[in-house]
A protein has these predicted regions:
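Glycine-rich phosphate/diphosphate-binding loop of Rossmann-like nucleotide-binding domains
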Residues: 200, 205-316
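Rossmann-like adenosine-cofactor binding region
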Residues: 268-368, 373
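Conserved helix-loop functional segments at active or binding sites
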Residues: 187, 222-230, 326, 335, ...
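N-terminal ligand-binding/catalytic initiation module
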Residues: 1-207, 439-449
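Adenosine-phosphate binding glycine-rich loop
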Residues: 2-29, 224, 338-450
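Active-site nucleophile and cofactor-binding loops and adjacent substrate-binding regions
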Residues: 74, 170-171, 206-213, 238-242, ...
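General beta-strand structural signal in soluble alpha/beta enzymes
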Residues: 110, 164-168, 192-196, 262-265, ...
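Predominant activation on well-ordered alpha-helical scaffold segments within soluble catalytic domains
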Residues: 13-14, 31, 35, 105, ...
Length: 450
């Protein structure tokens, strides 16, 4: 008898914990997925025999490397870089690069695991990966960021390629960093090829890519509300973060007639009861992308707004969009949101809500969309950037906007297919986990034991 026939969820998770010491976020991500998958595969012997879940929870490979660079004072600095290639059953590895001092191998393994299911959900041929370094771009000069990116790519280039692994941006990696890394890759291999996504539009980037994650999270939110005969118009929203995902989520909420009350960064949050309109969002984008300033400056600029330390979840609103980072919304904060009447939560960030927080939303029957479904618009448009690069064409903003809307609708429908609880409530976590898992698992079955 195959071993997994005798293993229950607790025993399985014990094994995951033992094999991945000191990687709590990875264990948390596997736990969240496994509880749904254990139910789903209970009567499906082929998945047990092939040990599919066990194999998906073990990355294909983890590459770790030294990144040396010289700062402006001529000090030699040493950072650690990684690329986690989790699973390429349905397409080349695909997933962002994160530069943040908190990055560890465990963080990237969790993100690559989530990415595998997310990419599957998009319906596009993309496997899952993630990379990064414990480098802090904050406070560094452009020249320092350039030297770091070049050094990082000097090692990374040998592990990636347009049909092998196609990284993109993530926290701390925006257009500037992608430009420096793409330039270095091209210089080393002497080929122009679509090895990174999120590129500038002058050199092969896709229209709609910068907006796609934030807009997509709002489209998913709109789909959830529509499923219950509701709409975004006239509703208030609390949003965390003030980076790429948060500002574009705020923009789309505003365009659809909602009112955004908060944005944040790691220093605290601003509360603007008048609403953060397009003009103010543009000001925040400039503050963050050009001036590289702090969100607290917003309260100096706009009368009526206030700055507070901590996170924004105590501000009462109908909708919540965590768009900063993992584990930024805990059980108590989820209870506060519920108490204040939140109707729906759509995650722009990856795993921003703790497992306990998710249970609070489910128990209160609040519509709750996990990041792997709600923020998949970014990687979906990255997939479309890969297609455009391969075909040497570029589609316009309008066409890509329509494609993004359709893709998010398709993801929503897959979630409802597997997550409908029969009483009108949809468990989007379960729906996303099962739909994402099934496609990858079936591909792996076709390959045999590899
Ligand atoms: P950015 O670097 O553009 O912005 C990140 C934002 O989150 C900043 O406001 C940052 O504040 C804040 N933040 C980061 N770490 C923390 C922390 N520990 N505590 C509080 N605030 C924090 O990143 P993105 O907007 O691209 O990414 C945000 C989230 O969305 C991440 O979880 C990412 O994985 C996810 N995501 C991004 C995609 C994309 O296309 N960019 C695609 C899918 C998911 P500060 O400036 O102070 O650090």
């Amino acid at each position: 008898m195959p071993v997994t026939d005798h293993v229950n969820l607790e025993q399985f998770m014990e094994g995951v914990k033992k094999r991945n010491p000191g990687q709590p976020e990875f264990v948390q991500a596997v736990q969240e997925v496994s509880q749904d998958i254990f139910d789903f595969i209970q009567d499906k012997v082929e998945y047990h025999e092939a040990q599919i879940l066990r194999r998906i929870a073990e990355p294909d490979r983890v590459v770790s490397f030294r990144v040396c660079w010289e700062d402006d004072n001529h000090n030699i600095r040493v950072q650690r870089g990684w690329r986690v290639q989790c699973n390429n059953a349905i397409g080349p590895y695909k997933g962002g690069i994160r530069f943040h001092p908190s990055v560890t191998e465990g963080t990237l393994k969790f993100l690559a695991f989530e990415q595998t299911l997310k990419n599957s959900l998009t319906g596009l041929p993309m496997g899952g990966g993630k990379g990064g370094a414990n480098f802090n771009p904050k406070g560094k000069s452009d020249a320092e960021v350039m030297r770091f990116c070049q050094s990082f790519m000097t090692e990374l280039y040998r592990h990636i390629g347009p049909d092998t692994d196609v990284p993109a941006g993530d926290i701390g990696v925006g257009g500037r960093e992608i430009g420096y890394m793409f330039g270095q890759y091209k210089r080393i291999v002497n080929r122009w090829e679509g090895v990174l996504t999120g590129k500038g539009q002058e050199y092969g980037g896709s229209a709609m890519r910068p907006e796609a994650t934030g807009y997509g999270a709002v489209y998913f939110l709109r789909n959830m509300l529509k499923h219950r005969d509701m709409d975004i118009e006239g509703h208030t929203a609390v949003i965390s973060g003030s980076g790429n995902v948060a500002t574009h989520a705020a923009e789309k909420i505003t365009q659809l007639g909602g009112k955004v009350l908060t944005l944040s960064d790691s220093g605290g949050y601003i509360h603007d009861p008048d609403g953060i309109d397009q003009e103010k969002i543009d000001w925040v984008k400039h503050l963050k992308n050009v001036k590289r300033g702090r969100i607290s400056e917003y309260a100096d600029e706009f009368k009526g707004a206030t700055f507070h330390e901590g996170r924004p979840w105590g501000v009462a609103a109908d909708l919540a969009l965590p768009c900063a980072t993992q584990n930024e919304l805990n059980e108590d904060e989820a209870k506060t949101l519920v108490k204040n009447g939140v109707k729906a939560v759509s995650e722009g960030a990856n795993m921003p809500t703790t497992l306990e927080g998710v249970h609070v939303f489910h128990d209160a029957k609040v519509m709750y969309a996990p990041g792997k479904a709600a923020n998949a618009g970014g990687v979906a448009v990255s997939g479309l950037e890969m297609s455009q690069n391969s075909e040497r064409i570029s589609w316009n903003h309008e066409r890509l906007g329509d494609m993004l809307t359709d893709l998010m609708q398709g993801i929503h429908d897959k979630c409802t297919e597997y997550g409908d609880q029969g009483d009108g409530y949809v468990d989007y976590v379960k729906g996303a986990n099962i739909a994402g898992f099934k496609k990858v698992a079936d591909a792996m079955l076709a390959f045999g034991v590899v």
